Amino acid sequence: MLTIELDDLKVFMADDGSAKRIHFATSHAHALRKDSRGKPFAWFNVPFRNTIEPLMKKELGSSNFALFLSKTTDKPFRMVFNEKEYEDILAFMGKYKDIVFLRDCLDLSLSLSMNRIDENTRTEIGELEYQAKYHPESSEYSNVIASLTERMQGFLDSIPFFKDADYICVVPSSHAFVREIVSGLKGFDFSDISSSLSWNKTSELKNAESLEDKLDALLNSHLLIADEVDLKEKSILLVDDLYKSGLTMQYVAMMLKNAGCSRVFGLTLVKSLGNN
């Protein structure tokens, strides 16, 4: 069982410049390349194994699938020796084209989309997230929530692991509309325990500027988990709207694991353009 300690969060905060996301629609569109000499048939290169390796293993239907670390770059790679595996990986990249794979302390961590294409242009989901967050009074608000719910529903229906969680929970500091989305999900076996988590005080969280200040604020905000929720050996899917630094979600995941959870998955609507 993967554990999360306070030191893990501090290491994560000490940004060394390493990539924290994989996005096949943009920065990693050329992760799969045919070898010009045909030896091997192709190469698959990504900056980290987190989340992507277990999902590829499951989606490609091979328990033997693995990404290996390069001795020269210390980055994951895979030699592809035949056209079938090449096409399988290409299909995986197509299915997850807009999804953002995240490197953090959770067992698995994804965003449905980037929030922006560039500084001036939002993605489709990024625009919906923006409208839901900043224009709840709009006559289109219910349609926006319905669209976001439909997208999350479709995503969870189509991928492994996440839909099999025992619980789903909105990160306590999330905007209210995220709970509306989660409450609209249908046909899953997980129970919504969002109301069982809360902060004892949140003012410091809102005022924190640096990651160091935010971690101090998280420690001082005292996350409360209701006693009646049985977390022992349970898996939980944490949901939030925007993944920026990811610190709050990882802190909540740490506290849930300290309370007995075996696995914590993270799913956000959008990933910010910054933070690698």
Please annotate each region the language model reported.
Residues 3-10, 202-276:
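PRPP/pyrophosphate-binding module of the type I phosphoribosyltransferase fold
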Residues 55-61, 89-92, 179-189:
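Short, aromatic/basic amphipathic alpha-helical patches
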Residues 162-173:
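Short glycine-rich phosphate-binding loop at a beta-alpha junction
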Residues 176-179, 275:
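Short catalytic/ligand-binding loop motif for oxyanion handling, primarily in non-cytosolic enzymes
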